[in-house]
Amino acid sequence: MEGQTRSGSARPGTRTGLGPLPGTHGVLQAEIPSKKVNSSFQLPAKNSGPASSEPRLTLAPVGPRAAVSPPSERPRLVLSSPRPVLAPLSIAGEQKRPPPPHSSNRAAKSVGQLVVSAAAASKPPPVASVSILAPKSLGQLVISASAMPRPSPAPLGSVLTPTSRDQKQLSPTSVGPKPALATSGLSLALASQEQPPQSPSSPSPVPSPVLSPSQEGHLAAASVTSTPASERQLPARQKDTAVPRPTPPADKCLYTPERAAGPATSPPRAQAFSDPRLSPSFRARPEAPRHSPEDPVLPPPPQTLPLDVSPGLPESGTRSPGLLSPTFRPGIPSSQTVPPPLPKPPRSPSRSPSRSPNRSPCLPPAPEVALPKPVTQAAGSGRCPSPNLQAQESPAAATTTTSPTSSWSAQPTCKSDPGFRITVVTWNVGTAMPPDDVTSLLHLGSGHDNDGADMIAIGLQEVNSMINKRLKDALFTDQWSELFMDALGPFNFVLVSTVRMQGVILLLFAKYYHLPFLRDVQTDCTRTGLGGYWGNKGGVSVRLAAFGHMLCFLNCHLPAHMDKAEQRKDNFQTILSLQQFQGPGAHGILDHDLVFWFGDLNFRIESYDLHFVKFAIDSNQLHQLWEKDQLNMAKNTWPILKGFQEGPLNFAPTFKFDVGTNKYDTSAKKRKPAWTDRILWKVKAPSGGPSPSGRESHRLQVTQHSYRSHMEYTVSDHKPVAAQFILQFAFRDDVPLVRLEVADEWARPEQAVVRYRVETVFARSSWDWIGLYRVGFRHCKDYVAYVWAKHEEVDGNIYQVTFSEESLPKGHGDFILGYYSHHHSILIGVTEPFQISLPTSESASSSTDSSGTSSEGEDDSTLELLAPKSRSPSPGKSKRHRSRSPGLARFPSLALHPSSRERRGGSRSPSPQSRQLPRVAPDRGHSSSSRGSSEEGPSGLPGPWAFPPSVPRSLGLLPALRLETVDPGGGGSWGADQEAPDPNSLSPSPQGRLGLEEGGLGP
């Protein structure tokens, strides 16, 4: 009632009087003292709103009289107006609070509003005369107000007023938005030169130089009447917002009485709302739905902030992609609009995450508020920063994507999401041994899940590849790979893929909870040394689809020396042309949505001599060397480099140093320093069609967060270089192919039951299996136990498997379950960490099987089997005879090496408590002990299977080693007089009859 009383007094007093005003130009000054002419129009004004409670205060004029001739187009305004001026007045007064008192500038802007409504409004002749005179009087009032000295702002804030459509700003003296006009979607004006600083509600009135109270009352009725007509400039869904709504949330967002008190300047309209969700620092929380499709409340009109978080139901075809709310997805049923809350790994033991829980919703707000729209240029945000910027880890604005329950989400990401973060590292190690610590090189941050990267690509060159070293690396994991796996494992990173070509290695890691959304992983390599016959030079690559976007990582080692620039160009073209990938996605390297090209590219600095280069480095004038860098020059001349981008070279050249120091080459050769180690990226230009993943052309944006070298590592003559990138996806394909369900805790062996649901598009294989991993596992084969995924249907597309008691780890710990797909060669479904608390007192009895063989005295030299051509713990694909272990996909090409986890005492065998090799009974359909799971295999045969006679007794891997297989004839059990072989001995069994339990060779 208070707002209505104040606004009611404003209408007849200050804003728009309802009395007839003379229609000619010269009558205005003569009619000012007279109030009798206006008396006939006071009754409609009273009917349209409450009576005036403070008429004298609202009649206060602003400045001295200034007679100005009105515009000539105002009379034409009346002739085109078919609508009565006072018709909608009662509607606005019934449902909305009338505008509070305002200065004469308000009347002038209301007449501007009247101009908009006059083209389509219908007014009778008596009202037409009022409309003719009102603009004239207000024109004089505006000019006189702008010409006079401005008093201090009024204690009561004025109201936002709509003006012409081309004005998009606010009045600096306005404090709160006007409810009746904010919902209509009209633009707000910032007219500091024309606005009187004192409100009509000021307690110190001054004589009116222009209008009488009744004449101002006329203008108030006309301005209020013009509001519905101006709404025709808006879309249909915004017209509806002008209809009064009694909903409290809308009132709170549109008007706050507290902010109308006090002389405060108003922020822009998008920030003037009292709702904290609309403030620039507000972080949209993914788990809090913005609106529901059933909500009848419509959103406000487009604002300066690109994120629309007001409640409302978007009508089809009326909402632009740039204004999509974080939870709006076109074409998705209403029940799928609200995403489930993000899981927070690794502490909430629950179910399989349906998406990548990469970000906690409680992140601090990003410093930047502006959010790039999905339709912006894909490579626009990836431009190089200014050269004067230091390559430091400055914060970058990024975005988050909520996870839907549909197959993909098409909404723009939220402001609070730091995006998908990728760290790329390149290092020419110069055949050196790995250092002790690489934490700073990998930018792992504080170890918190919200710090650091989501994916890390590591490219190494000149890894020791001598014959004896290569033979050792063929049997054992190379030391560099072990170093990075050991360093990244505690940070929840898992090795996704790796490829090696002599001394060139590429390792790709990702957080374990991203694995279900990384698909179609493939590798390739190209030799360019000695005409393509030697792999000391060339390139290795890993490509994959991350959340539906095709990414490719290319690690190259190109020819050296100053005069080999053209040869480097030819080698790069050869690598791009020869490396092709299979599948429906991108085939060539440049066909991917995003390509990272890095390595020891060996580009040098031309023209300048050694002394000038060192002087520029010592004086920190690196920009003088940029224009003579061969790669920078090649970007402008080589067509093959079109579209590749690189950050500023704000770090010193990374080659060549004396090993063990930070001094440049002091040998007799005195090599000139150069930026040989580089990291570039290229975003595929939008072609107007779908991306290789089948989505829209505007797919992602790339921003380089940092680009620097690491001078603290001195083991090589090169310094490692690292770059951090932030990827902002326009959509995320974030639905796992398999969802695993498990209890929060396994306190008894009977609880070791796993249920999983598969998507209809998932191509299952009989080689699929489910592994049990400790938190911090290093790669997909680093499991504690496993069970074959037999796909026995339980309910619809829900399946169930059970881990045997013998395969379960004893004691207490945090574990993760993962579904390994043979076709995808990666975990396509994982759970959140859960607890296993099994009593350790049962370990002795459970570790003894029916053969009576004790596991005491067994050493920790469990052998891990790898295909010799594979640098990944994952075995190569094969269609040969099936093994009982997921680690044995093929037999003729197996290699042995002890696992580092075994050296630490952990079990790598799928059955940690029964690793003693028992004798297999003659009946090949039964076994004396269970392996992995006591249930039937995928083929329906009970228990573990025996090897067929075609498997040789000795695999001939090493002269001193011979692996015994199950006796094809079955044999008999151990007799009382037979001596069991020493399990610590690797020599062949003298009896030659020790059976090898099937699957015992598994990793």
Swiss-Prot record:
The modification Omega-N-methylarginine is found at residues 56, 65, 83. It comes from the Eukaryota. Residues 284-294 have a biased composition (Basic and acidic residues). InterPro entries: Endo/exonu/phosph_ase_sf (IPR036691), IP5 (IPR046985), IPPc (IPR000300), SKICH (IPR041611). Residues 11-24, 180-196, 349-361, 390-413, 840-855, 907-919, 927-943 have a biased composition (Low complexity). It is found in: Cytoplasm. Its main location: cytoplasm. Residues 197-210, 338-348 have a biased composition (Pro residues). A motif (RSXSXX motif 4) lies at residues 882-887. One of its GO terms (molecular function) is inositol-1,4,5-trisphosphate 5-phosphatase activity. A motif (RSXSXX motif 2) lies at residues 351-356. Keywords: Cytoplasm, Hydrolase, Methylation, Phosphoprotein, Repeat, SH3-binding. Gene3D superfamilies: 2.60.40.2840, Endonuclease/exonuclease/phosphatase. The keyword Signal does not apply. Residues 160-174 have a biased composition (Polar residues). A motif (RSXSXX motif 3) lies at residues 871-876. GO terms for biological process: negative regulation of neuron projection development; phosphatidylinositol dephosphorylation. Belongs to the inositol 1,4,5-trisphosphate 5-phosphatase type II family. Inositol 5-phosphatase, which converts inositol 1,4,5-trisphosphate to inositol 1,4-bisphosphate. Also converts phosphatidylinositol 4,5-bisphosphate to phosphatidylinositol 4-phosphate and inositol 1,3,4,5-tetrakisphosphate to inositol 1,3,4-trisphosphate in vitro. May be involved in modulation of the function of inositol and phosphatidylinositol polyphosphate-binding proteins that are present at membranes ruffles. The 5 Arg-Ser-Xaa-Ser-Xaa-Xaa (RSXSXX) motifs may constitute binding sites for the 14-3-3 protein. This is Phosphatidylinositol 4,5-bisphosphate 5-phosphatase A.
